[in-house]
Amino acid sequence: MTRREFITLVSSVSAIRPLDARAERPLDRVLYFTYSAGYRHDVLPLSAAILTQLGRDCGAFEIIATEDLAEFSTGNLGRYAAVMFYTTGEIPMSSVQKTALLNFVRSGHGFLGIHSATDTFYTWPDYLDLIGGYFNGHPWHQAVTIEVADAADPLVAFLGSSLQLNDEVYQISDFDYRGSHVLLRLDQSSVDLSKDSVHQRFYGWPLVWKRFFGEGRVFYSALGHEGSVWQDPRYQRLLTNAILWSTRRSA
């Protein structure tokens, strides 16, 4: 099945439309920022293409993909409803740009982090407060079972109780478990916990969560290394739901 066929499938059977009460709202612009100061993921071009198509199919948002740091000014950010990071490393943002991003989210806009967004800004404590945790290795790159931690949450209710995916699996350190609502977590029985690189923590292996930063809605998915994950209709629907939630088109 081609990428376009995957996208057509999800648009026809599982894409979510905005709430009727907000149907006349103009398209929300979402800044998809893919600057890689560290490892650069091969999947970035595919991810941008799929997100762009999801926005078109949904009819609620428009994706603007960029690596231009100039977008992070108060004036430029004002053109967007949300910012989405698929980034790595210590991005060379100025203190003014960092403050602009924090104020943007605090004031009620959305922030979404994908995969290596937690492998970003280790030396900026406010970023940890924003996203909720840091990447701490990926002991597994395989087919795993993923538990739906809150099957009643609208972002993941369509998944049932669990799903299987083949992807690079992150473990998270410094996780703000009290301030985060975990939506998906690794089923520990589906992996080898005896590997030397495994760090067992009391909160396990959260893979998808949502949280708030000031008045802003924050979403993070550790999934998304593999192109096959991006082409999966379930992942596409999850991201569509997350964008609609972060931009306040859904509760």
Residue ranges and their predicted role:
Residues 37-38, 90, 118-120, 187-190, ...:
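Short, solvent-exposed loop/turn segments at secondary-structure junctions
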Residues 25-27, 34, 45, 49-57, ...:
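Extracellular ligand-binding/catalytic regions of CAZymes and related secreted enzymes
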Residues 32, 39-120:
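Helical hinge/lid and interdomain linker segments adjacent to catalytic or ligand-binding clefts
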Residues 91-161:
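A glycine-rich, often tryptophan-bearing local segment used as a flexible ligand/cofactor-contacting loop or short
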Residues 5-23:
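N-terminal export signals
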Residues 25, 133, 138-214:
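Catalytic beta-strand/loop cores that center a nucleophilic Ser/Cys/Thr
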